[in-house]
Amino acid sequence: MPRGLELLIAQTILQGFDAQYGRFLEVTSGAQQRFEQADWHAVQQAMKSRIHLYDHHVGLVVEQLRCITDGKSTDADFLLRVKEHYTRLLPDYPRFEIAESFFNSVYCRLFDHRSLTPERLFIFSSQPERRFRTIPRPLAKDFFPDHGWEPLLMRILSDLPLRLPWQNKSRDIRYIIAHLTETLGEDALPRCHVQVANELFYRNKAAWLVGKLTTPDGTLPFLLPIHRTDEGELFVDTCLTTTAEASIVFGFARSYFMVYAPLPAALVEWLREILPGKTTAELYMAIGCQKHAKTESYREYLCYLAESDEKFIEAPGIRGMVMLVFTLPGFDRVFKIIKDKFAPQKEMSAAHVRACYQLVKEHDRVGRMADTQEFENFVLDKRQIDPALMALLRQEAPEKITDLGEHIVIRHLYIERRMVPLNIWLEQVEGQQLRDAIEEYGNAIRQLAAANIFPGDMLFKNFGVTRHGRVVFYDYDEICYMTEVNFRDIPPARYPEDELASEPWYSVSPGDVFPEEFRHWLCADPRIGPLFEEMHADLFRADYWRALQTRIKEGHVEDVYAYRRRQRFSVRYGAISSTANSS
């Protein structure tokens, strides 16, 4: 290769990333208009298209590089010089951290995920940690209650860029003050102030005002979800001021926010104070930088591995028929491999399973489906693998594994947040905790269905419980759209003997689902059955599911709340209006 080509290649990669992130910001900047126009289907489409942008631009850069190098192979020294030139371009670059991930992605695409070494890739960042600890330009604005909280909140709401009228701004301000007074106390409130992010965070049918509430005792989140009525009037639905509530809003089971972030590292650093339980990977994920979140997730994994002497073991729970799942005992994530052969009742291909995981990545997860990161050629040290797991890997997924002596390479896997399997949770809890878990499970099913997702296999083992007690679906191999399912009532038996027969007396076609049958496996436990019948009996009726299908086919997009219904101002302080409640 001619000298000087290394710099051209480095510049080409960085220019390719510039183009990708420019389009990312362009799609993101349309969020306000989509919200104001209530174009909810465009919201869903923008979410999908923004996810696709990254891989699309990686592909464009790879084609450019193949043209530049005329398809000739490159030696190791040449690649190291390319990385050195690229590193020199980053110190003054505002999105250096994601640019490093983009470089990694281009390299992996060019070399088919081979030779992934720290020398060739940005396994760890080349730049100082948290370079934007001091933010170069303000991301937020401070508001002080010099003349009381009512004018302070009036200024905050009036400063918003939204161009719709308010339904009743004074009422919403009263509700916010009432909440703050209940939470902080009347004496403390005058000594507090608020810092509000300059950009709104858009997701689903809400525009979130995200801020920090500084109190005499510390800093709290200050989150206001702003909705619009069918008539196009704005209202604040609630006020959230605890780290637990904020953690759920920014949770791993939710869709990515649309927030205009030309300096993503600075925004992540700013968010860190009100989301102390979130890792760097989770914060990048929340603002839509999911590919860099994957990089950060891998770094977190490597750091944990370096400080731990634990061995990889099979994950607790009932062994799956499609996926082999393992973990490190103290690590908060699991590793999932598609088996080479599935159980006989699972009539599907590995390609189908991967398509299901991609569907979840692109769809609105409504807080009920765990996000995943996909990896290829994942290397594990054999010394850190429990012998029982090693035997299981060789038995269930030998075609996915390459033995390199001291290491194995797993051709393809997913990393996902670790949760307590719901079936195990239900065995361990009693009383109110059991009731809450069953309520959560039913709510998860309803919210998934309203978002046009049918889980397929609804057994408790396919759901997990988060540290906040939320029930989340994580087994995607039978997932499909609600509109693809034929929900049927079981026909009456022709003769008494029909109900005792081993085969059904009625025809069953592909796509047929009989909700009455759910009762057999969801209500078998005498502790659970009565609770389920009390709270979720309608899930056993085909007409309930068909009614949801009708709403979906008519184009209705359901509201998705990242908090309990009882926290809504309309419930706490009186009805906003029938119109607002139906928005």
Curated annotation (Swiss-Prot):
Gene: aceK
Function of the protein: Bifunctional enzyme which can phosphorylate or dephosphorylate isocitrate dehydrogenase (IDH) on a specific serine residue. This is a regulatory mechanism which enables bacteria to bypass the Krebs cycle via the glyoxylate shunt in response to the source of carbon. When bacteria are grown on glucose, IDH is fully active and unphosphorylated, but when grown on acetate or ethanol, the activity of IDH declines drastically concomitant with its phosphorylation.
Protein name: Isocitrate dehydrogenase kinase/phosphatase
Result after altering S570G: In strain: S2978, S2979, S2995 and S3057
Outcome following mutation: C303G: In strain: S3041 and S3044
Effect upon mutating Q20R: In strain: S3333
Keywords attached to this entry: ATP-binding, Cytoplasm, Glyoxylate bypass, Hydrolase, Kinase, Nucleotide-binding, Protein phosphatase, Serine/threonine-protein kinase, Transferase, Tricarboxylic acid cycle
Domain of life: Bacteria
